[in-house]
Design a protein with these regions (language model features):
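RNA substrate-binding interface of SAM-dependent RNA methyltransferases
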Residues: 1-92
């Protein structure tokens, strides 16, 4: 009998350090997280192929090691909005 597998999501809310956010992306990628929600003042990854980046985006890219390309992510104003989105999308 096949085991039921839950869909995993991660909400990163009000984490100031781009280095820490990049590390969370890398860890989420390894753990099989399907989607990451970024909310509050949490920094977002740089655009794909971006050349001009802020110091925070450079720090993110250095620690994420490309995980932002393999884990879907979405920006939300609040963590509550992210929770509502994940509930509607069937994350448990």
């Amino acid at each position: 009998m096949a085991a039921h597998r839950r869909r995993l999501a991660l909400i990163i809310h009000n984490v100031r350090s781009a280095h820490n956010v990049g590390s969370m992306f890398r860890t989420a990628d390894g753990a099989g997280v399907e989607m990451i929600a970024l909310s509050g003042y949490t920094p977002v990854p740089p655009e794909h192929g971006a050349v001009a980046m802020t110091a925070a985006q450079k720090s993110f890219r250095k620690t994420a090691l490309g995980a932002e390309a393999s884990v879907a992510w979405k920006r939300f104003r609040t963590a509550a909005e992210a929770i509502g989105f994940f509930r509607k999308e069937g994350f448990g």
